[in-house]
Amino acid sequence: MTRKYFGTDGVRGRVGDAPITPDFVMRLGHAAGKVLALGQKTSQGKPTVLIGKDTRISGYMLEAALEAGFTAAGVNVLLTGPLPTPGIAYLTRTLRLAAGVVISASHNPYYDNGIKFFSASGDKLPDDVESQIEAMVEEPMTCVHSDELGRARRIDDAAGRYIEFCKSTFPYEHDLHGLKIVVDCANGAAYHIAPHVFHELGAEVISIGNQPNGRNINAGYGATAPEKLIEAVKANGADLGLAFDGDADRLQVVDADGRLYNGDELLYLIVRDRQASGQRVEGAVGTLMTNMAVELALKRLGVSFVRAKVGDRYVLEELNRHHWQLGGEGSGHLLCLDRHTTGDGIVSALQVLAALRRSGKTLPQLLDGVSLFPQTLINVRVEKGFDWQNHAGLKAVRDRVEPELEGRGRVLIRASGTEPVVRVMVEAEQVETAERAAQELAAALRA
């Protein structure tokens, strides 16, 4: 079923343009209240949902719209103010609430925003539940009787509760004393959370990207723009740099030499540390874009590897299907289901730090078993509706190229979901091999 509003991570778009308007978001809150909450009345008679947000200026407007929609549906609302997305997942579960809602567009610029939902268990909603909400949005919005209206109030200790949870995922027998860490909060939801977590565990913390003004989220800072973090690590002689995105559900790491490590490498590191700690790791989940070197390295550790569609929600689905615990994406979404129900940048950083502390090794030493293959990506613009999957010339070139990689590389061809482009990606041990194969495949598409 094609969905009208929900994408891979909730409803998202440019603020002021449909669907990110106050009117639609109010109707969305009302619809979600009907679908998620009204079957879960509490001893007080009304279900309660939790609403958090990042630091975008539009968050005030959309928060008010959601509040109106939920309360009109007879649902009580708790407001946290700015809080990382995984913090909302955690509090929704531990406070025994009917649902959690996050107002954020993650790593996007400030003029975008979005709405995503968590179930009572702190999991992202499955596609079928989002489809139910979409169907309800199309129904006329009706307000419950005045006696049944919901109430709204702010929860004052949300940040403190979440900070303590994050710290609890770090091994008690270790601390961070003696480490100097630069923490880049992307001027986002972690600005008043992440520095405290690492400081309270003993680290010397240097914070950057921690002065949000409503319009500077992700602007030159954070996981999608690590240049300032690299500079700060070198300038301050820090041991490590940690970068989060606007809602702090993804992580990038920089070592003392300024080298950047992405989610693929960090997934391997966490798997290896779990094994070194005596934990059995049967398998891990990546995506179609996960570097093949990681897949091969995990197999050398005896760990099965499965690829999901791009998007952390699909990684989670595969983890649940196989009853595994560890997965992630190169973008820095890492799932450690033995620690949290969803991807969490701060918790992921603590798993990396735990590996460093337990092993006494550096990042390069812990990652000596994996060297990422060079990737070449070419975007080929095509006519709308172009049937690339049945393109005879492309098939002929692919049938010739793939055997030449000899199982030490791969070809991935897929259509963009947002523009008339076919993406051709080739991985190989040698950059020249990847570039040559990608050029040949792209030329076949253009012919």
From Swiss-Prot:
Q: Which UniProt keywords apply?
A: Isomerase, Magnesium, Metal-binding, Phosphoprotein
Cofactor(s) this protein requires: Mg(2+)
* Lineage: superkingdom: Bacteria
| One Pfam family linked to the record | PGM_PMM_II
Q: Keyword Phosphoprotein, does the record have it?
A: yes
Catalytic residues, chain numbering? S106 (phosphoserine intermediate)
Give the sites modified to Phosphoserine. Answer: S106
Function, in words: Catalyzes the conversion of glucosamine-6-phosphate to glucosamine-1-phosphate.
Q: What is this protein identified as? A: Phosphoglucosamine mutase
Organism of this sequence: Cupriavidus metallidurans (strain ATCC 43123 / DSM 2839 / NBRC 102507 / CH34) (Ralstonia metallidurans)
Q: What is the lineage of its organism?
A: Bacteria, Pseudomonadati, Pseudomonadota, Betaproteobacteria, Burkholderiales
